[in-house]
Amino acid sequence: MSHQPILCLLLTAVTVLSSCLDEQDFHSPEQPETPSVPTVPEGNYFADSLEYTPEKQRQTLTDIQRGYFRFFYENCQADSKMALIGTERSINTVALAGSAYAATAIPVAVERGWITRKEGAQRFLDMCTFLNKAERYHGAWSHWMDGKTGTGLPFNQKQQSAGDLVETSFMMMGLFICSEYFNSEDATETEARAFVSKFHNEIDWNFYTNGEKTLYWAWDKDLGFAPLKITGPCEALPAYLLALSAPEEYAVTEDVYTNGWRGNKFFNAGRTTYGYTFELGGEEKGGPLFTTQHPFLWINPFLYQDNYADYWEFCTNHALINRHYSLNDAPKEYLYDEYNWGLSACYGPEPLGYKGRAPGESRDDGTICTTGAMGTIPVTPFYALQVIRSLYETPHLQGTYGIADAYNRSLAWADSRYLSISVMPVVSVI
C-alpha cells in the first residue's frame, strides 16, 4: 500500500439539506435554553402515536440532528472550544473522541444553515489551536484533556498521562473532513488547514507498534504501553488506515495491518447468526453497535475494500443481528420490541452504570442506548426510523438537547444526560 494521505469519505454532510436551509440561525450567546425534561404523567414513558407524514419525519430528523449539534456548539469547553465529555461532567475536561465527532459535524451545520461558514471555520481553527498546544505523546493526544491547559488527564489505571492512538485517529479523521470542506483561501480556513497538515506530519504511528506487527491502543509516559493491542474488527479501523498512509518516517508497513488488524479471531468463514452472514470477529452476535458505526463516519463501508471482508454487509448485518436478538432472544422482561432496541455503550441505572452493552446474557441488562438504533440509519433505515419516531415521542427522554442517552423499560428508568461520544456521531449519520 502507498503511504499517500487518505482522502476521507464524508458520507452524509450534504445528504439531508432539503428541509432546513431557510431555518433561522442560532448563535450560542443568544440562543434561549430549551426547556428541560417536561413534566408528564407518571408511567407515560413511551410513545403512543406513531403516525408520521413525510414532512413530520423530516422535521423529526432535523430536530434531533440540530439539537445534538447545539449540545456541542453551545455547550463546549469555554477555552478550547472542544467537546465536553457530557452533561453533568466536569466543565473543563474535554473528550478527544467527542471532539472528533463534533468536528465532523461542523460542515453539516454549515450546509444546513445553522451556523455560517465563517463561524464554522472559526470553530475549526479554535479546536486546532488548542490541539496544537495540547500535550502530545509521540504525536498522539490524550483520551481526556484539561480544556484550559491542554494537559493530558487520567482515563484509567493504564492511561494516567498517555497518548490514545485510536481516539487520535478519530480526531484526525474529523480534522481531515474539515480540511476538505473549508478549502478556500480565506485566512482562517488556510491557517486551520496548516495545523492539520502539521499534525499529520507529527504523529509517530510506528512508535505505537512497540516493535511488533500490531498497533497498541495507548502509551503512557510513565507506565509504558497499555496491554491492549488493536485488533479488528472494532471501532479502531481508522488508526490502521492513517498509520498506513502516514509520512514514510512514521508509517507502518502492510504486514502490521495484516497481522494486527486481523488478530486471532478475525475471520470465521461461513458463520451465520440468525441467518445473517457474520464472518468477522470473535463475537457471534456482535459487540456494541458503536463499533460498526463510529469508524464509518469517515470511511464508506460500501466502497472500502481489503482482502478480508465486505464491510457494508458486516455493518448491515451487525445492526440486523442486534435487532433480531432484542426482539426474539432477549429476556421478555426487558420489553424490547420494534420500537425499543439498540444495544451499545451508554449510561445505565445504578448500580448498572456505564458500559458497552451487546447481545448476550452477560452484556445485556435491559438498558437501551438511544443512539444505538439511530446510528443504524445508513444501513437499516426503515428499522432505525421506527425507533427514532418512538424515541422522539417519548416525553421522559426529552431534555435540553433532545433525546437523552439511555433508558430501561423493565426498570422504568429514563436518563436525562448526554454524552458527546454518543450524540455527536448522529449529527453526521442523519
Segments the model singles out, each with a brief description of its role:
Residues 37-430:
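Ser/Thr/Asn(+Pro)-rich, low-complexity disordered segments
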Residues 1-18:
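Sec-dependent bacterial lipoprotein signal peptides
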Residues 15-50:
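Bacterial Sec-dependent N-terminal signal peptides
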